[in-house]
Amino acid sequence: MTGPVNLTAYFSNAWIAVAPAAFSYGPAILQVFPDAGSQAGGDTLYLFGFGFGTSPGSLTLTIGGAAATVQKVESLPSFASALSLDATYPFSLERITVTTPPGSPGKADISITASSGHATAPKYFQYLNASATFPRSGLYKFLLNDPLRQQVYLSATDHVDVFDRTAQAFRSPIEPPPNGPPPDAGLRGLALTPDGSQLIVADFGAQSVYLISPDGGANNGAQVPVGGVPGYANSGPARVAATSAATVFVGLSGEGGSTGGCNSCLGQMDLTASPPTLEPAPQPEVTSLTGAPLLQADSAGDTVYLAFGTAPGGPVAQWTAAAPNAFTVSSANDSSSDLSTSADGTLFAMRSMNATEIRGPDLSLFSTPVSAELEAIPGRVSVPGVALHPSGALLYDPFLDGPPPSAPPAQGIRGGIDIRDAHSGRLRLRSYLPEPFAMLSADVDGLHGNFLTTDENGEYLFALTTSGLTVIQLASMPLGIGSLSPASGAAAGGASITIRGSGFQSSTKATLGGKSANVTFKDANTLLMTTPVLSAGPQQLILSNPDGESVSLDAAFVAQ
């Protein structure tokens, strides 16, 4: 027997007392935070578990076979406040603080040898492929990945900086057309048309939207004045979403008091008109909705999800290219503060009162990820920029471990990213950034900033941090399930199913309804599966990789 066991005391009066996990046969590692770090080493990790002993000198700990430096060993009372645990917490938990050694990119085992024995936590830590900050002076608030050109756009106050992903260097910035930045410029949200030919930029300060060719050249763009919102001291466009119907939805925001609710904060721009002009969105389902909308389109521009956090009932909405003259609206009763859409358009994430919700294409809520006790970070602040893996399998949740400053520089705080399973909410990976996010205390929601995005495969993470752009490249993507298409079929089997997700390998295996299913690898985010003979009803899908990693999704497929 190894690991923690309960202690039970039996009394002559028939009473018993139980101390859960009060004794451990040798060391046992429960969790490690963070569980991703630089291949150069030097990161501080916290290992939680049992049977570690009391002296750092009596422990030997290795990560990927290389010796780590043990800083200290603590029993629960000394670190309870760091996890917001009180005296009612029943387990005799222990914590080791270590400094990571250098390592090779990929998953690594953590092994510990104590006077009481030895234990190994297989694949518990990931050395990142890359983690670097590229300095650039600017008050950045929003960023956008361009998969066609392999570029990242960063909106500064009066221009858009361009980061070349291949060269890992900044290129010449893009200035607002036609004659450079106006004196009152205040750039915010960014979007690309589905074909990538135009970069759409919202200028809150100048109350304009810019249509720009990212390739540059003469006459490479146009300015479309959109005006502000009556009754507000400051107002203008904050978010934009381009569609496959050659339209752009514009979310306007008002700040500094109002004489009434905003009844025209969702606008629609026709890109085929010359010149393009903005009008209030004409669809009857949204004409009566008030408040500044958060909005984002999928990569094809076929679906746009919206959230009206200040409107009565806190509604969410969906627009589709299949029915461009109508919206689907549902009352969510949420005070939404951030929103992100998966590139596939199969689901969207939104923040409400510091909780993150995952909703499906029918706008229904199916997941609200929460932190387990040991995952909690006291003083955690959500950073605008919640993101989804392109398939919808994973949620990228940016945070600070303390309040952001009112003005630069940020001191005494760290920035990090939690990667969670979008369906179950389970924490799959936590990584800290080399420096904090560039969030300021005024950046209260997704109308004021979007500090995190991913590449087209969810492998590269791009973060706006205090001195520029931080780029993280994961060495191993967490295995995840995003969606199945179609999600139902004949119980007789033989149906061809496309599985979208993350972390797929050529040797990934699948079981559906407890039966092995034939799988063909297409790419790291796509599998083709042939269904086996099944019983009628909903079926659980389980995917597994050769290193033992597995993930499941209940009712993933309905056999009919």
Language-model segments: residues:
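Blade-level signature of beta-propeller repeat domains, shared across WD40, Kelch, NHL, RCC1
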Residues: 442-478
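Repeated scaffold domains used in trafficking and secretory/extracellular systems
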Residues: 138-144, 185-192, 230-242, 285-299, ...
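Beta-strand/beta-sandwich contexts
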Residues: 14-59, 68-71, 75-82, 117-140, ...
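Beta-strand-rich domains and repeat architectures in extracellular enzymes and scaffolds
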Residues: 134-158
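A short beta-strand motif characteristic of beta-propeller blades
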Residues: 129-136, 169-181, 218-230, 275-287, ...
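Short coil/turn segments that connect the beta-strands within blades of beta-propeller domains
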Residues: 148-150, 195-197, 245-247, 301-302, ...
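Short glycine/acidic-enriched loop and turn motifs that connect beta-strands
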Residues: 159-160, 205-208, 254-261, 310-313, ...
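Short loop/turn segments that connect beta-strands within beta-propeller blades
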Residues: 164-168, 213-217, 270-274, 319-324, ...
